[in-house]
Swiss-Prot record:
GO CC annotations on file: mitochondrial inner membrane
Transmembrane segments: 331-351, 524-544
Skewed-composition ranges (Basic and acidic residues): 103-116
Example GO BP: inner mitochondrial membrane organization
Organism name: Neurospora crassa (strain ATCC 24698 / 74-OR23-1A / CBS 708.71 / DSM 1257 / FGSC 987)
Protein's job: Required for the maintenance of the structure of the mitochondrial inner membrane. Involved in mitochondrial morphology. Causes growth arrest when highly overexpressed.
Region (Disordered): 61-174, 408-428, 443-497
Similarity comment text for this entry: Belongs to the SHE9 family.
PANTHER family: SENSITIVE TO HIGH EXPRESSION PROTEIN 9, MITOCHONDRIAL
Protein name per the record: Sensitive to high expression protein 9 homolog, mitochondrial
Subunit structure: Homooligomer.
Gene that encodes the chain: she-9
Keywords, in A-Z order: Coiled coil, Membrane, Mitochondrion, Mitochondrion inner membrane, Transit peptide, Transmembrane, Transmembrane helix
């Protein structure tokens, strides 16, 4: 095999036009490990003799332009033989999913076949003709294989879908669902925190505390700057003191040398010269240190004044803000008290009568059966009384008939008469006998009626006692109808106009008279007393604080 190998790669579909030709010094054995997917050999750096193969889905192209033919390449083309490699089409896709090992075997088989089926041409013209014919045949076979692959894939897709749906819920899906819920919860919490911070900032803006926050931040910056200025001032003061002490020691040494000027030697002269020069340098350094110290003191004083002013301003603004909040809280407290009073009035004059009326209606419905029974018994008693009255009337009618008969007998006996005048009874005696009989019959009837009435009364008392023991909660005393406003006003007017009634009412307030109250009424009285006491205490405290505040002002 020659050093130059020309590879003609034919594109599979008809839409992929052109062939790729590359010249390289690499042998063909390096192309044996290419996968059976569509291979796109992209050649970059042809001039450097390097070869790079890149895998693309269904397209073969060169990333760079092919190099121009050099005289050496032209000589190689004329003298050497060129080998043309045609990439075979991939086999049709199988329904079963191939494993990684089988994929490697198919790849090596396809590569070996491509090497064995590689024809050799004697000339460049025959190579081009055979490549064109193979391009057309390869395109047709590739289109057929692609259609078969598409059909097979479409047939296997429903089976895979059915297998997916038949599988139970996997832990991965549960974990993904939990991850989505966790992400959603995190998003909700982040939004909540953002809204909370926004609401806090809005509240600060409305109440005017944002300006105080700015003053606090500015004071913090001034405090940091003031600390730095103090450190610079300490350094400048220490530098000034050290330079001053050094110059003083130098001046003392110079004075000592001048005192024994007559006994100087060359070393003393040299020392004096150096000390004099050092004194001049120290003088300049001391002047500069004094200037730096003055600037540091000025800066520290300015920052200290600014910091004190900022602290005073913050205190003043916070005092005003606290007074405003206190004033608003006072109005809010009064508003809450007003709402409580309004609720109390609504409960007492609207809700409580409605509830009482509803309760009475419920009690009336519950006692309707008992009242019907009582009415039935009263009707029976009335019928019994009416029946006894009819019996008494019939008895009186019977007695009147007997009296008429007796009168008739008496008249007949008086008309016939006893000739002796003493053998028969007189009319007065007969009337007395009749009256005695009538009185005896009337007494017997009255005794019977009294006994019957007493028995009925005892039965009614027993029934009432039984009802009282059975339903003590549902029985209530009959309530009098509520008085109107006019009647109440008249009653109060009469009570106030009469001193005796006023005295009796006052004495009755602390008397030992027993009254019956419900627990609900006692609770309402306690709540009313507590509300009244709280209102009185709050009013007194408000007026005291207001008077103290006005006194301080």
């Amino acid at each position: 095999m020659s050093s130059t190998t020309a590879i003609r790669l034919a594109a599979r579909p008809s839409s992929w036009r052109g062939t790729g030709a590359l010249s390289s010094g690499r042998p063909l054995s390096q192309f044996a490990s290419l996968p059976r997917r569509s291979i796109n050999p992209s050649i970059s750096g042809m001039r450097q003799g390097t070869l790079r193969l890149s895998i693309h889905d269904g397209r073969l192209f060169f990333s760079t332009q092919p190099p121009k033919d050099t005289p050496e390449n032209m000589n190689n083309k004329e003298t050497g033989s060129s080998n043309v490699i045609f990439m075979p089409p991939p086999p049709p896709a199988q329904t079963e999913a191939p494993s990684s090992g089988s994929a490697k075997e198919d790849t090596t088989d396809a590569t070996n076949k491509s090497e064995t089926e590689t024809p050799t041409a004697a000339s460049e013209s025959e190579t081009s003709k055979s490549s064109e014919s193979d391009v057309s045949s390869a395109s047709t076979s590739d289109s057929a294989n692609s259609s078969e692959t598409t059909t097979t894939t479409s047939e296997t897709t429903p089976e895979n879908g059915n297998n997916d749906t038949a599988q139970p819920e996997l832990p991965s899906r549960t974990e993904a669902h939990r991850a989505r819920l966790s992400a959603r919860f995190s998003t909700i919490m982040d939004n909540f925190q953002t809204r909370l911070l926004t609401a806090t900032q809005t509240l600060n803006d409305l109440t005017g505390y944002s300006a105080i926050e700015q003053i606090k931040r500015k004071n913090a910056e001034l405090e940091v700057a003031h600390g730095q200025a103090q450190s610079r001032l300490r350094d400048a003061r220490h530098n000034y003191k050290s330079l001053t002490m050094h110059r003083a020691s130098t001046q003392r040494e110079v004075t000592t040398l001048l005192a024994r000027k007559d006994t100087w030697n060359p070393l003393d002269l040299e020392r004096f010269t150096s000390l004099y020069r050092l004194d001049h340098e120290l003088e300049a350094q001391v002047a500069q240190a004094a200037q730096e110290l003055t600037e540091a003191e000025t800066e520290e004083s300015r920052l200290s004044a600014d910091l004190n002013a900022g602290i005073l301003k913050r205190y003043h603004e916070e005092q005003i803000w606290s007074d405003r909040i206190r004033r608003q809280s006072t109005w809010g407290t009064w508003g809450l008290m007003g709402v409580n009073v309004l609720l109390f009035l609504v409960l007492q004059f609207v809700a409580e009568p409605w509830r009482r009326k509803r309760l009475m209606k419920g009690i009336a419905e519950n006692e309707k059966g008992v009242i019907d029974e009582v009415r039935h018994e009263l009707g029976q008693v009335r019928q019994a009384l009416e029946a006894s009255g009819l019996r008494e009337t019939a008895h009186l009618a019977r007695l009147m008939e007997q009296e008429r008969e007796i009168q008739a007998l008496a008249s007949t006996s008086s008309s016939s008469g006893d000739p002796q005048g003493g053998g028969g009874r007189t009319e007065g005696e007969v009337e007395m006998d009749i009256g005695a009989e009538f009185m005896a019959a009337a007494a017997e009837e009255a005794a019977e009626e009294a006994a019957t009435a007493q028995q009925q009364q005892q039965q009614q008392q027993q029934q009432q006692q039984q009802q009282h023991h059975q339903t003590p909660e549902t029985q209530e005393e009959p309530q009098q109808p509520p008085l109107t406003w006019k009647q109440t006003a008249q009653k109060w007017q009469q009570t106030l106009s009469d001193p005796q009634q006023i005295k009796a009412a006052v004495v009755d307030l602390y008397s030992d008279r027993r009254i019956d109250l419900k627990m609900r009424d006692v609770s309402l009285l306690a709540l009313e007393s507590a509300a009244t006491g709280a209102a009185v205490v709050a009013s007194v405290a408000f007026f005291v604080l207001r008077s103290s505040g006005s006194g301080k002002a």
